[in-house]
């Protein structure tokens, strides 16, 4: 369940923008909300605005985040991360993406930034009983696991590259529930419809041919 998504410096989006599913103070239609702890969550939402106002690029940012989490484990040495930065942003300005979500009744917070086509930083926290616990923080290639995870990410750290997300590496080379839950949220729970795709048959065939994770299930 999505709670909040933020991004900046992505295509036409220069400054940070935020999309929240957390309800405001209006309790007119309280029966339509979903409760999670102290949060009152909208079950659906609509983004609307004028043509060219950035709606599609905001969805594009969420799609970019999903795809990078799911597939960056396959990035080869020397292969950069595509950074769709704002055309007026300086080359050294990072593109930032962050998200909060609930999976199996636990809240998670995850985010990363891309600078000059490389992963700059990354983090994952979760909130058992409402209290923040660090799973990992990462700056460049320096990964700092939380106290509960000392030593369990050694293999994942050994394969980390500056073009790979650590979440993607750890999901494939560790057996940590919090990592798996976060990874599966992106891999299965987020579904992005792309209106630019007209032929879904060709798109499906292309995915089956090029997406290694899908190949494993075929």
Where are these regions (language model features)?
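Solvent-exposed, flexible loop/coil residues
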Residues: 17, 23-25, 90, 140, ...
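Structural beta-strand/beta-sheet cores of well-ordered domains, especially the beta-sheet scaffolds
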Residues: 3, 95-97, 163
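Electropositive, glycine-dotted interaction segments
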Residues: 109-218
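Pre-Walker A-like glycine/lysine-rich segment at the N-terminus of P-loop NTPase domains
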Residues: 1-64
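Short acidic, glycine-rich loop/turn motifs
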Residues: 7, 11, 101-103, 126
């Amino acid at each position: 369940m999505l709670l909040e998504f933020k991004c900046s410096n992505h295509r036409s989006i220069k400054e940070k923008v935020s999309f929240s599913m957390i309800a405001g103070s209006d309790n007119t239609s309280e029966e339509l909300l979903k409760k999670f702890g102290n949060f009152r969550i909208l079950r659906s939402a609509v983004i609307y605005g004028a043509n060219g106002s950035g709606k599609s690029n905001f969805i594009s940012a969420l799609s970019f985040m999903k795809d990078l989490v799911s597939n960056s484990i396959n990035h080869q040495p020397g292969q950069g991360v595509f950074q769709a930065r704002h055309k007026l942003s300086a080359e050294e300005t990072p593109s930032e993406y962050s998200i909060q979500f609930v999976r199996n009744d636990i809240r998670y917070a995850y985010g990363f930034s891309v600078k000059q086509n490389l992963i700059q930083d990354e983090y994952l926290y979760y909130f058992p009983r409402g209290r923040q616990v660090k799973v990992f923080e990462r700056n460049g290639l320096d990964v700092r696991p939380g106290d509960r995870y000392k030593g369990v990410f050694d293999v994942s750290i050994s394969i980390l590259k500056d073009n790979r997300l650590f979440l993607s590496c750890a999901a494939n080379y560790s057996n940590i529930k919090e990592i798996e839950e976060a990874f599966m949220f992106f891999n299965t729970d987020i579904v992005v419809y792309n209106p630019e795709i007209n032929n879904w048959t060709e798109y499906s065939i292309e995915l089956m041919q090029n997406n290694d994770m899908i190949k494993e299930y075929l």
